[in-house]
Amino acid sequence: SFPVPVPARGIHCLVLDEDVAVYETVKELLGANHHVLWRTTVASALAVIASQHIAILVTELQVGDGDSSVMLKTLKQEYPDVLTIVNTSFKDTLRVSQLINQAQVFRYLPKPLRKGLLAKSLESTLTRYKQLQDVPALKVASKVEVSQDVQEKALSSKIMDYLSRLRAKGFGGGVVVQAV
């Protein structure tokens, strides 16, 4: 069942992981009709998100410049139609359940990466993305509330400010960036 069947027009998928094999597997599964971008830090991922319409984010929770959890929660506030697949070796069930509830993580996949499971997850994620595009009310329902945790609120505010500054500098104009 490779590559994964997807909507007629190409989408942008961002892989945030230090492991190039994850990027290469996602790129192989989505095929040539879609844009798969790869970043290894939260900061560089935010630059891509500010410049591209990202449909799917495949991410590890711990990356080069820290924890991506707050970024995931913040992105869901600003970009409710971005669907996230978390692929991680972390087994902290409280943290995972918080991400599912607060950041609306669409799929959680344990590492090591299993290609068949990732393929099925990408397929269901693309189906859900198409539903979000076809029914605008679903996008509104997908938006999450701002975190009440003081530290998360402060970091979330910094992330939102960073995204705004990137857009103001012209990163919102559709520049395609392929790799690190």
Please describe what each predicted stretch is.
Residues 140-180:
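C-terminal output/effector regions of signal-responsive regulators
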Residues 55-73, 78, 93-95:
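Conserved phosphotransfer microenvironments
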Residues 50-52, 75-81, 102-103:
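Conserved phosphotransfer cores of two-component systems
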Residues 69-70, 91-108:
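Alpha4 helix (beta4-alpha4-beta5 surface) of REC/receiver domains from two-component response regulators
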Residues 19-38, 42-44:
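Two-component/phosphorelay signaling modules centered on CheY-like receiver
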Residues 38-56:
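Acidic, metal-coordinating helix/loop segments flanking the phosphotransfer/catalytic sites
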Residues 113-122, 126, 130:
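C-terminal output helix
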Residues 87-88:
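Hydrophobic/aromatic residues positioned on beta-strands within the core alpha/beta folds
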